[in-house]
């Protein structure tokens, strides 16, 4: 029977059909090779947008710097970064006038956060530029290395464990004449193996001390490492993203804390909330504009796009904003917050690995590191690369490029949102002083603008005024990529609005399926994704039931765990059949052990082990939940785990799911090949650091309201916490006197060992 597809849509409102337009089925594109070319593009573009600015030279590092602030007023529609300081300050003043006390209150909240933030805040985050090794490392390791170097150079304020004290060390480190660091290196030598009598390569790992003078240290402290952004859909070209080092991160964190606090109080800001909360906030603004545009007014909405938002923003402008926002605050607070923008005004971008060359016959390959780009003969490069390198040469210092203007991706999302909202705020009638007025939504570089006016000319005039006002603060609305609709239909941050936000369920499609962590986690993540989509994305009961059946089928094929009574033959079917026959209560077997599926859309919130526990044979329970089972290396048992879920569009989301640890929660063993390289020392440091952090977390779980306060080392904090907890447990009768005495003895021993050390 042929089905006419148009019949499917007869009863469906147009906006619900959005899920059928899903374009992203395959894998997203990933980048290979070096990001050097993309980084050069970014640097060259950024300088081009600000080319009429003033050139100066940084006295400390010798880096040439371009300052476009208060540059020429725009005469055409080309994107430009010439923000006018007085315009930005005025926009801030009007924002404060419309929201009395907003800056004052946010400053107070931020001061409180600064007093309480621990340095371990910086261990969050993935790859971080590690200035001691001059390459990327996991955040925790990069922080540990930085602190280790600081301490060996006599900077010890960080020992209090407060982030603000670590930042004091950072500032002090910049005044030092030299910094001594330890680097890892690797020696190879050929030796004869005693057993086999063959020649083998023996590798030894050494550490050597290296002194960095003030200039080189400053360059490293101001360096952002660059990488290529992966998995970006809908783009022909890749682009570069930056990862800052530990010196900059803490300062950025405090600035963003202040900006986040301001954004929370602004109804036009799409940050820092997300999901349904964001939709509700945005729907309010739209409702306000539609209600106010009575029958006499027209209302249009622009789905906006800005040209190269980051590359036209300027850290000097952010400094002006912060100076204004904190103007009545204590000196120390203003200083702490102004350091991030000052560092960004003097930032250096690391060019990455450099270029790879292959000979015509493909026999020879050689890598030209970024450091060599200053001196190498350009005849080896093609036309476009040659142009790039020529442009960038005057800015090069030791493989890093001076990049004063521009912001790099994702650095000051909240603060730049405040700037955007301040322009939206100027659309009120009391500021436009005419018949048109505007409002809108802003989330980082994405915006939607709603303009109301009595007639079409008024709408046009309103849009023009908005466009010009943006230009004055370095925001370039793209006339080519923005489009206008009657209010009621627009798109903002991949949310589609049509008389209300439309659930675009197809965007979540890539996150359905089997994650491939292990049998236990995969089952849990799979059903949680379905549950979450029923809550958030209008996934209806019939579709959810179908999704569930498809998921179970997929899961069984992935882990070859078809039901014990099935006819399908796989490598596991012999064992699973045997288990099926021995089991009295077959409903109690987990799906991954060949059991039946007991999930339906009503019980998706219950972990499978809990769902089937009462139905299990006793000996099966004993095998399943046995921490001593020698075949399973267990994860730490946490009640909640986090999975990274990839929607089709936008950033990877973190999703919580229930984790019941069983013998199915195995972790694959780590690849051994890393152990023979110079990374080995780093890896061991990392594991030790990880263990310490885990231990510390056990003493001070993040849910605990008793955070370690005051100046003490991690060990002292843990010992004192152990003593307090032991006393409480002893007095309430949870532990015996002997146990209490033993704990106290261990604590004293630890303190004694520390003293001897």
UniProtKB/Swiss-Prot annotation:
Listed Pfam families: Flu_PB1 (PF00602)
Modification(s) after translation: Phosphorylated by host PRKCA.
Catalyzed reactions: RNA(n) + a ribonucleoside 5'-triphosphate = RNA(n+1) + diphosphate
Main location: host cell
Keywords in alphabetical order: Eukaryotic host gene expression shutoff by virus, Eukaryotic host transcription shutoff by virus, Host cytoplasm, Host gene expression shutoff by virus, Host nucleus, Host-virus interaction, Inhibition of host RNA polymerase II by virus, Nucleotide-binding, Nucleotidyltransferase, Phosphoprotein, RNA-directed RNA polymerase, Transferase, Viral RNA replication, Viral transcription
Name assigned to this protein: RNA-directed RNA polymerase catalytic subunit
Protein's job: RNA-dependent RNA polymerase which is responsible for replication and transcription of virus RNA segments. The transcription of viral mRNAs occurs by a unique mechanism called cap-snatching. 5' methylated caps of cellular mRNAs are cleaved after 10-13 nucleotides by PA. In turn, these short capped RNAs are used as primers by PB1 for transcription of viral mRNAs. During virus replication, PB1 initiates RNA synthesis and copy vRNA into complementary RNA (cRNA) which in turn serves as a template for the production of more vRNAs.
Region listing for Promoter-binding site, in residue ranges: 249-256
Motif (Nuclear localization signal): 187-195, 203-216
Example GO biological process: symbiont-mediated suppression of host gene expression
InterPro entries the UniProt entry points to: RNA-dir_pol_NSvirus, RNA_pol_PB1_influenza
Family: Belongs to the influenza viruses polymerase PB1 family.
All residue ranges annotated as the RdRp catalytic domain in the record: 286-483
GO molecular function: nucleotide binding; RNA binding; RNA-directed RNA polymerase activity
Cellular location(s): Host nucleus; Host cytoplasm
CC terms in the record's Gene Ontology section: host cell cytoplasm; host cell nucleus
UniProt EC number: 2.7.7.48
Region Disordered, annotated ranges: 50-82
Biased composition (Polar residues): 55-64
Subunit structure: Influenza RNA polymerase is composed of three subunits: PB1, PB2 and PA. Interacts (via N-terminus) with PA (via C-terminus). Interacts (via C-terminus) with PB2 (via N-terminus); this interaction is essential for transcription initiation.
